[in-house]
Amino acid sequence: MTLERDAAANTAKVLSEALPYIRRYVGKTLVIKYGGNAMESEELKTGFARDIVLMKAVGINPVVVHGGGPQIGDLLKRLSIESHFVDGMRVTDAATMDVVEMVLGGQVNKSIVNLINRHGGSAIGLTGKDAGLIRAKKLTVTRQTPEMTQPEIIDIGHVGEVVGINTELLNLLVKGNFIPVIAPIGVGENGESYNINADLVAGKVAEALKAEKLMLLTNIAGLMDKSGTVLTGLSTQQVDDLIADGTIYGGMLPKIRCALEAVQGGVGSSLIIDGRVPNAILLEIFTDTGVGTLISNRKRP
């Protein structure tokens, strides 16, 4: 009986601690980039869906943007289509773009929507082609070595960058009590499809909606200093300094730049969160300490 009482007391404590945070975020929009291990473990997938439904139930407006790189790679392999990468970006020819649309706009998107709906939510799956949600243009990639007099332009196919976001559609869905789930496929001015990095799409969606938070789920505990210690709170200036001194480098750099630009573009804060931790989103927004790394020019509440 004591164990049951202790468990009940812990639950009551958590709910009591969460109350001021729920009040703070009621009516606010949070954009969550969903990817990595959180999309692979059945337990974590279920937990993510329940967390999103809970957020909506208490009056917070979650908007989900998802990735799907491993799933794209798996189908390309099964179809004997070779994958090539330039600076971490998948070279996307016409055949690869067809697969990207099938996987992101079909398999992955609808599985997330279905999971959220099974747990009591009202999710709607979208790609950037729906009502021109994500307007895009072809991404230009250049490379230059000391021996070159001019930079080399590298064609990586149907890889795009965001030009604009249809906020009218998203606001309409949010006001209708729906949870938008967005696949990062953009549409060009002539109707062409573009494969866009999900972190970048999430950042631009957060900026366009003037979201309270941008939350990027990752496979790491947060942004770390050179000694391996997680940095829990950083200003935009501190992030710039860490980029300049080489603390932030490699594959983490694009993600951090995306988080940084979102804050500079009007988002309240950006967070790098360990998606391997069960209920990581709720731990961040509903507890006193939070988890991961917060980037903001405000103090952590």
Curated annotation (Swiss-Prot):
Keyword Nucleotide-binding found:
yes
Q: Which reaction does it catalyse?
A: N-acetyl-L-glutamate + ATP = N-acetyl-L-glutamyl 5-phosphate + ADP
What Enzyme Commission number does this protein have?
A: 2.7.2.8
Where does the chain bind substrate?
G68, G69, R90, N195
Which BP terms does GO give this entry?
arginine biosynthetic process via ornithine; L-arginine biosynthetic process
Q: What is its main location?
A: cytoplasm
Family matches, as Pfam families: AA_kinase
As for subcellular location, the record says: Cytoplasm
Q: For site (Transition state stabilizer), what residue positions does UniProt give? A: K33, K255
Q: Which InterPro entries match?
A: AceGlu_kinase-like_sf, AcgluKinase_fam, ArgB, Asp/Glu/Uridylate_kinase, Glu/AcGlu_kinase, NAGK-C
**Signal peptide region:** none
Q: Name one GO molecular function term.
A: acetylglutamate kinase activity
Q: In which pathway does it act?
A: Amino-acid biosynthesis; L-arginine biosynthesis; N(2)-acetyl-L-ornithine from L-glutamate: step 2/4
Keyword list (alphabetical) reads: Amino-acid biosynthesis, Arginine biosynthesis, ATP-binding, Cytoplasm, Kinase, Nucleotide-binding, Transferase
Q: Which domain of life is it from?
A: Bacteria
Family statement drawn from the similarity comment of this UniProt entry: Belongs to the acetylglutamate kinase family. ArgB subfamily.
**PANTHER family, A to Z:** N-ACETYLGLUTAMATE SYNTHASE (PTHR23342), N-ACETYLGLUTAMATE SYNTHASE, MITOCHONDRIAL (PTHR23342:SF0)
| Known function | Catalyzes the ATP-dependent phosphorylation of N-acetyl-L-glutamate.
- What HAMAP family does the database record attribute to this sequence? ArgB
Q: What name does this protein carry?
A: Acetylglutamate kinase
* Gene name for this UniProt entry: argB
